Regions:
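Iron-sulfur (Fe-S) cluster-binding modules
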Residues: 1-76, 102-106, 124-126, 132-139, ...
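Short, acidic Gly/Pro/Ser/Thr-rich loop/turn segments
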Residues: 53-54, 89, 116
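Thiamine diphosphate
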Residues: 78, 83-96
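Hydrophobic cores of alpha-helical transmembrane segments in multi-pass integral membrane proteins
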Residues: 80, 110-115
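Short His-Asn-centered micro-motif
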Residues: 83-85, 111, 142
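A short, gly/pro- and small-residue-rich
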Residues: 94-109
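Short gly/pro/ser/thr-enriched loop/turn and capping motifs at secondary-structure boundaries
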Residues: 114-118, 147
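Short glycine/threonine-rich loop/turn motifs
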Residues: 121
Length: 182
């Protein structure tokens, strides 16, 4: 619902705080169009799915044609976190720190069944899905996921980015500091 104020209609509190300083209608669509074709990936690779991820990122499948090319080596330069492989409880605070260091807007992809749900590692050391510690935008299941699934997932993420509003861009730091087992 919009808030009427002084003859103008504002879509959210965030847009109301911006006032007349920022145009948020057509400009948001143009910025989203540019963002969906320019992902800066930070790969957080911990297990065997990493080999398949390297295959997908290589020249045969060429993620560059979808705007997800050269990986960044600092989370401060990235806006797409690819979490690939099993996450242990000791790695969970590191993953949260990496997520919090990323620039806004940021997106997270859970790559592989171990990242999505813990996989076949149902024990006390494994995080049962990274969505218990950081927000996830896209799940790509599989052991390991087929390259076609990764490309399809990336196309779905591009569609999600295109439809985002200004309010969706501000996610903030992860409120969860440690992994909890469900």
């Amino acid at each position: 619902k919009g808030v009427a104020g002084m003859g103008k209609l504002y879509q959210s509190d965030l847009e109301m705080s911006l006032g007349n300083n920022v145009i948020v209608t057509q400009m948001t669509q143009a910025v989203n169009w540019a963002r969906k074709y320019s992902f800066f990936i930070y790969p957080f690779i911990t297990a065997c799915c990493g080999m398949e991820f390297m295959s997908v990122a290589g020249p045969r499948y060429d993620l560059d044609r979808f705007g997800a090319a050269f990986p960044r080596f600092s989370p401060r330069q990235a806006d797409l976190l690819m979490v690939v492989g099993t996450i242990s409880h000791k790695q969970a605070p590191i993953l949260v720190k990496v997520y919090n260091q990323m620039t806004e807007p940021k997106w997270v992809v859970a790559y592989g069944v171990c990242t999505v749900s813990g996989g076949f590692y149902d024990n006390y050391t494994t995080v049962m899905g990274i969505d218990t510690i950081i927000p996830v935008d896209l799940y790509i299941p599989g052991c390991p996921p087929r390259p076609e699934m990764v490309i399809d997932g990336l196309i779905n993420l591009q569609q999600k980015v295109q439809e985002e509003t200004l309010q969706d861009h501000v996610k903030g730091p992860s409120p969860v500091t440690s992994a909890t087992r469900i």
